[in-house]
UniProtKB/Swiss-Prot annotation:
Region (E1 fusion peptide loop) residue spans: 896-913
Motif (Nuclear localization signal): 64-68
Active-site annotation: H152 (charge relay system), D174 (charge relay system), S226 (charge relay system)
Organism: Venezuelan equine encephalitis virus (strain TC-83) (VEEV)
Side Extracellular, residues: 276-701, 758-772, 817-1224
Phylogenetic classification of the source organism: Viruses, Riboviria, Orthornavirae, Kitrinoviricota, Alsuviricetes
UniProt motif (Supraphysiological nuclear export signal) ranges: 41-48
Protein name: Structural polyprotein
Gene Ontology cellular component terms for the protein in this record: host cell cytoplasm; host cell nucleus; host cell plasma membrane; membrane; T=4 icosahedral viral capsid; viral envelope; virion membrane
């Protein structure tokens, strides 16, 4: 699960046999402590055997002897040979002399691996060292006929020809270059811009290339390697190394490389150091010296060495000085000492513990700090005791040493207990730090038993398991998926974090004072001094002693105080220890067990059961642990949801044609798109048509049905009213005339009895004979009314909802078009040029990157409160010194320690003073756990396009800015700018744990306590730290020496708890957010204008292409709103065989094919996508056109897992069947109205004619 295996893993559980085992004889149990000691002895022997095997030189003579030894043998003659042979024989028979063996032993070089051997072979003639003062300061290499050397590397190239070349400087790339002579060009490297992710080779082994960055394991490569090349498997140079920076367990390299166009590109990580071999100088007594070669070391002059380290504590070469001071020159180096041996400069101490077995006490195992910020369940403690050292200060694994009233004692680490709610498993310890794995609890206790006395110390601290990912599990799973996390390193490597040390102050030790008879005796420990202060009968005594001395003036132990003095050991700068008088010599040592990037196994929640509906998705969830469900719409408004689900639940969501995404726990995101489908049949009966359109367009369908119902109702009502009025108008004259006969037609129409009157034919005959113009007008009135009503109904109701787009074609070889900015959607078009055959163009964007220009404002992380040991002055006053550290607070407290009581044991009562100082610094794990605040500016867009022009194809990267062209085969392509200047990033963004957040952070220097940005630094390693944490010092109690304070909680920790989901889950338009560099990919927004400049050579004359004499198009199958769900078959007769471009000038259909092969006679199958129910489009084949039309059916699947590659600006049209039913309905209503109008007209004509006749 974790990248660091525990030092002593627990044994696996034995297999359980389901059958009963036979009874075994009883044996007495062994003592568990004896078994532990045996195991410790076995481990020690195994480690010793392993080290001896590893350090043993290889057997037999060396493969090749040095030239110096060979020349000495020739000069020495036969006598020397005899002596050497005799010496060899004696060495075989007798045991070797250990002193001589150690003195003559040379460090055996490890045999280089295959990668190193290959690089060394290639470097031999093509890489040249740059010498400075007799040392290799860097390297120069010859690549592609040019000499490259880093500009920051001073010195002369170790080649007379190359050293004489006059170089040109490129300060932007930190390089100097020159053309090499012609006779040397055959031996130069070749370079390449191809850099697939994987491993490459250089002088020190393998180099990993990932996400545009070259990294090597930490410790591989150092100063002096600047200018070395990185090679691929074919021996081509992919990059030149300039420097590096440590990033946890790996080192990121600063390199110069080449892009696809052969242009030099430089990549430099933050806080990168140049790797020229520049000697760092340190200072001692106003004399400078190389930090790696100090004049003194700790084993010979410990006090002077600590003073030297204190003077150079802020020097950039402090680490080199510390390593050299610990390892004296000529001293034998053991592999265990190389791990972490600098803590021999320190000693353990006793400090106040707030909760021992019975209240507070002065404990040898006081707990200073506890941290458990990793995702692996481990806890790192800092205590007053030390680990890995014995009582004498020598390295000894699995051992704890502690201070017991001035005497340093040791105890095996397995006898130390650590527990929270249950016992913890101690992994290892180094210096003041202990690494353990503990169960959850609200406090942590450490204890051990020595000489029947149990020592313990407890501190309140909530220990809990911190899960990583989107599932809140409480224990690491056995199976799952690997995810990036932060774990505590199980080693003591230098990872850039320090803990502050200083010389211990004068500690009162009452055990040194005893009463012998009637006088006081002070006995200092062996090898140390003691400061004695007494006040006996008005006589004050103050002197330093290094052996036992009696003071006859004093008769009581309370009259004297004895202080232990030691200036050859450091202690941790704890607030529980008093500060030494005068200028305190400070230092710093490395902190082990820091957080590092690793891989953790996280659980996978059971897959949700998905049920698809019409534009909806139902998720049935069964989480084992509390699991987050995150959803968003892939449109302009994401409408994201973020819900923690702990119990089985069902959630329903709406899915649109633009897409919907959900993330369940630690599963990868899943996306779904809705299709233009619905129940019913758009080509069926009226109720099926209504059902279909009601589900697709509910509001429009309801509105249309309401209008139709209103028209029918009005029509029926109007017809009825007209009929009644006509009947009344017809019958009224006859009712008023006695014995009048009603004509037969009126009697039938008006349901009246017939009466004698002039008939219709008689009236028409009268008009024909007397007024023929009126006769024709009377006949044309009903026909005119019918025509007018029909036209009005068609204008009102028959609105065609189609959008027609112009085809993308250009009459010349300069062609401009626009394609959607959506990855994976192919865009096909043709170029029509007079006299030439159509030229097909196909463009498919495979990836679209939007990279903003960002500026790092500051870095913030969890803070650590540093406290100086309090300065205590008895019988006197003090003042605060000027403060210069971040958020530093200083305060003087008077009257803190009563007379001869309390932590200071002062002789005065109220004149005693204490100066308390506290300040803020970055936490030890800030390098691994921090957030970066950026300001984002104008974004650049890169499109990775697969372009086909005619029969020529290329995969290229285009900057979508409207200015940068791409050329291939004579075609010049310019893309952009984007139609929509849009970006998912706000002006202020925060990067944390590989994810990006839009967050309005405070400006640099304006942080508030308890909020994001309470501490700010320009970079992780810079010293310009700003802090505002509301740090307030409190008055100390007299019982113990300490520095109490209050402080606001960490704003960074609070932000981590309260932060919303990152842009990875909330960005609009389905953007995919990545880091290194910060970018958004595949945002489906806007369109990309394209301009083509096509040479004449790519066009084909019309005479050389086929011509269709007859063509007929039939739609075999058609599913609208589906991914190329239409199949068209074109039967044709061509003039000759050949290849023709196909295209649809309108936007009704999108073709899958850009060209088809034609024979003299046959058929061609073409796939297309459309959003119309009744598509009708003109298909261009070469220079001929053929019309395709037919009916399309809705898709069967409601939800699909990929977007639809058709023109999504179209919506499905109303089917012809629906229009037929609609016009029939409206036509029926119109017939009633027309009949009523005709009747009214006939009646009016008849009445008027009859009145005129009478």
């Amino acid at each position: 699960m974790f990248p660091f295996q525990p030092m002593y893993p627990m044994q696996p559980m034995p297999y359980r046999n389901p059958f009963a085992a036979p009874r075994r004889p009883w044996f007495p149990r062994t003592d568990p402590f004896l078994a532990m000691q045996v195991q410790e002895l076995t481990r020690s022997m195994a480690n010793l055997t392993f080290k001896q095997r590893r350090d043993a030189p290889p057997e037999g003579p060396s493969a090749k002897k040095p030239k110096k030894e060979a020349s000495q043998k020739q000069k020495g003659g036969g006598q020397g040979k005899k002596k050497k042979n005799q010496g060899k024989k004696k060495a075989k028979t007798g045991p070797p002399n250990p002193k001589a063996q150690n003195g003559n032993k040379k460090k055996t070089n490890k045999k280089p691996g295959k990668r190193q051997r290959m690089v060394m072979k290639l470097e031999s003639d093509k890489t040249f060292p740059i010498m400075l003062e007799g040392k290799i300061n860097g390297y120069a290499c010859v690549v592609g006929g040019k000499l490259f050397r880093p500009m920051h590397v001073e010195g002369k190239i170790d080649n007379d020809v190359l050293a004489a070349l006059k170089t040109k400087k490129a300060s932007k790339y930190d390089l100097e270059y020159a053309d090499v002579p012609q006779n040397m060009r055959a031996d130069t490297f070749k370079y390449t811009h191809e850099k697939p992710q994987g491993y490459y080779s250089w002088h020190h082994g393998a180099v990993q290339y990932e996400n545009g960055r070259f990294t090597v394991p930490k410790g591989v490569g150092a100063k002096g390697d600047s200018g070395r090349p990185i090679l691929d498997n074919q021996g081509r140079v992919v990059a030149i190394v300039l420097g590096g920076v440590n990033e946890g367990s790996r080192t990121a390299l600063s390199v110069v490389m080449w892009n696809e166009k052969g242009v030099t590109v430089k990549y430099t990580p933050e806080n990168c150091e140049q790797w020229s071999l520049v000697t760092t100088m340190c200072l001692l007594a106003n004399v400078t010296f190389p930090c790696a070669q100090p004049p003194i070391c700790y084993d010979r002059k410990p006090a002077e060495t600590l003073a030297m380290l204190s003077v150079n504590v802020d020097n950039p070469g402090y680490d080199e000085l510390l390593e050299a001071a610990v390892k004296c020159p000529g001293r034998k180096r053991r592999s265990t000492e190389e791990l972490f041996n600098e803590y021999k400069l320190t000693r353990p101490y006793m400090a106040r513990c707030i909760r021992c077995a019975v209240g507070s006490c002065h404990s040898p195992i006081a707990i200073e700090a506890v941290k458990s910020d990793g995702h692996d369940g481990y806890v790192r403690l800092q205590t007053s005791s030390q680990y890995g050292l014995d009582s004498s200060g020598n390295l000894k694994g699995r051992t704890m040493r502690y201070d017991m009233h001035g005497t340093i004692k040791e105890i095996p680490l397995h006898q130390v207990s650590l527990y929270t709610s249950r016992p913890c498993h101690i992994v290892d310890g180094h210096g003041y730090f202990l690494l353990a794995r503990c169960p959850a609890g609200d406090s942590i206790t450490m204890e051990f038993k020595k000489d029947s006395v149990r020592h313990s110390c407890s501190v309140p601290y909530e220990v809990k398991f911190n899960p990583v990912g989107r599932e809140l599990y409480t224990h690491p799973p056995e199976h799952g998926v690997e995810q990036a996390c932060q774990v505590y390193a199980h080693d003591a490597q230098n990872r850039g974090a320090y803990v502050e040390m200083h010389l211990p102050g004068s500690e009162v030790d009452s055990s040194l004072v005893s009463l012998s008879g009637s006088s006081v005796t002070v006995t200092p420990p062996d090898g140390t001094s003691a400061l004695v202060e007494c006040e006996c009968g008005g006589t004050k005594i103050s002197e330093t002693i290094n052996k036992t001395k009696q003071f006859s003036q004093c008769t009581k132990k309370e009259q004297c105080r004895a202080y232990r003095l030691q200036n050859d050991k450091w202690v941790y700068n704890s607030d529980k220890l008093p500060k030494a008088a005068g200028a305190t010599l400070k230092g710093k040592l490395h902190v082990p067990f820091l957080l590092a990037d690793g891989k953790c196994t996280v659980p996978l929640a059971p897959e949700p059961m998905i049920t698809f509906g019409f534009r909806s998705v139902s998720l049935k969830l069964h989480p084992k642990n509390p699991t987050y469900l995150i959803t968003r719409q892939l449109a302009d408004e994401p409408h994201y949801t973020h819900e923690l689900i702990s119990e089985p639940a069902v959630r329903n969501f709406t899915v649109t044609e633009k897409g919907w995404e959900f993330v369940w726990g630690n599963h990868p995101p899943k996306r779904f798109w809705a299709q233009e489908t619905a129940p019913g049949n758009p080509h069926g009966l009226p109720h099926e048509v209504i059902t279909h359109y009601y589900h697709r367009y509910p509001m429009s369908t309801i509105l249309g049905l309401s209008i139709c119902a209103a028209i029918a109702t009005v029509s029926v009502a109007a017809s009825t009213w007209l009929f009644c009025r006509s009947r009344v108008a017809c019958l009224t004259p006859y009712r008023l005339t006695p014995n009048a006969r009603i004509p037969f037609c009126l009697a039938v129409l008006c349901c009246a009895r017939t009466a004698r009157a002039e008939t219709t034919w008689e009236s028409l005959d009268h008009l024909w004979n007397n007024n023929q113009q009126m006769f024709w007008i009377q006949l044309l009135i009903p026909l005119a009314a019918l025509i007018v009503v029909t036209r009005l109904l068609r204008c009102v109701c028959c609105v065609v909802p189609f959008l027609v787009m112009a085809g993308a074609a250009a009459p010349a070889y300069e062609h401009a078009t626009t394609m959607p900015s959506q990855a994976g959607i192919s865009y096909n078009t043709i170029v029509n040029r007079a006299g030439y055959a159509p030229l097909p163009i196909s463009i498919t964007p495979t990836k679209i990157k939007l990279i903003p220009t960002v500026n790092l404002e500051y870095v913030t992380c969890h803070y650590k409160t540093g406290m100086d040991s309090p300065a205590i002055k008895c019988c006197g006053s003090q003042e605060c010194t000027p403060t210069y550290r971040p958020d530093e607070q200083c305060k003087v407290f008077t009257g803190v320690y009563p007379f001869m009581w309390g932590g200071a044991y002062c002789f005065c009562d109220t004149e005693n003073t204490q100066v308390s100082k506290a300040y803020v610094m970055k936490s030890d794990d800030c390098l691994a756990d921090h957030a970066e605040a950026y300001k984002a500016h104008t974004a650049s867009v890169q499109a990775f396009l697969n372009i086909t022009v005619g029969e020529h194809s290329i995969v290229t990267t285009v900057y979508v800015n409207g200015e940068t062209p791409v050329n291939f085969n004579g075609v010049k392509i310019t893309a952009g700018p984007l139609s929509t200047a849009w970006t998912p990033f706000d002006r202020k963004i925060v990067q944390y744990a590989g994810e990006i957040y839009n967050y309005d952070f405070p400006e640099y220097g304006a942080g508030q306590p308890g909020a994001f940005g309470d501490i700010q630094s320009r970079t992780v390693s810079s010293s310009d730290l700003y802090a505002n944490t509301n740090l307030v010092l409190q008055r100390p109690k007299a019982g113990a020496i300490h520095v109490p304070y209050t402080q606001a909680p960490s704003g960074f920790e609070q932000w981590k708890k309260d932060k919303a989901p990152s842009l990875k889950f909330t960005a609009p338009f389905g953007c995919e957010i990545y880091t290194n560099p910060i970018r958004a990919e595949n945002c489906a927004v806007g369109s990309i204008p394209l301009a083509f400049d096509i040479p004449d050579a790519l066009f084909t004359r019309v005479s050389e292409t086929p011509t269709l004499s007859a063509a007929e198009c039939t739609l075999n199958e058609c599913v609208y709103s589906s991914d190329f769900g239409g199949i068209a078959t074109v039967k044709y007769s061509a003039s000759k065989s050949g290849k023709c471009a196909v295209h649809v000038p309108s936007g009704t259909a999108t073709l899958k094919e850009a060209a088809v092969e034609l024979t003299e006679q046959g058929s061609a199958t073409i796939h297309f996508s459309t959003a119309n129910i009744h598509p009708e489009f003109r298909l261009q084949i070469c220079t001929s056109y053929v019309t395709c039309k037919g009916d399309c059916h809705p898709p069967k699947d409601h939800i699909v897992t990929h977007p639809q590659y058709h023109a999504q600006t179209f919506t499905a049209a109303v089917s012809k069947t629906a229009w037929t039913w609609l016009t029939s309905l409206l036509g029926g209503s119109a017939v009633i109205i027309i009949i009523g109008l005709v009747l009214a007209t006939i009646v009016a004509m008849y009445v008027l004619t009859n009145q005129k006749h009478n």
